[in-house]
Amino acid sequence: MDKTVKYYMAPLESVTTWIYRQAHAKIYGRLDKYFIPFLEPHEKRDFKTRELQEILPEHNENIYAVPQILTNRSEGFIKLAKALKDWGYEEVNLNLGCPSKTVVTKGKGSGFLAKPEELERFLTEIFDALSGEVKISVKTRIGKEDPEEFPALLELRSEER
């Protein structure tokens, strides 16, 4: 096991934009990973201009950028992850941590943690569909309401794929 300390930049909406990530890397040196503020899969339209600016490969040159996906639908996650892979991204991140009320009430972000059966099905579907194609990491909270929820969350995907 590699015990080297890794440094990652978490996304902060409207702060850690592509311009900020590039300036940070140039001034302070590159971190190991930069997580891009979340994208949501769109079925009926292309990316918003702001989203497109964040994921354009030329805006993420010379850094290891990881797009973050916010959804509770495996089909949308899989489709978006494959599109991001085609753009050159090696890894995507599932956002299970966002505490925003508008996100949580839709069962996304940390709101998805309250539905362990659905979450387990979702995780199985995305890991099975994307195995060997793109790396998937997960940003989560230790529970939706209580830290005691964490052990059960860990059991959802305890086997390594």
Show the residue positions of the predicted features.
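Hydrophobic faces of well-ordered beta-strands that scaffold small-molecule active sites
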Residues: 7-10, 34-36, 65-69, 92-94, ...
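Glycine-rich, positively charged N-terminal anion/phosphate-binding segment
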Residues: 12-83
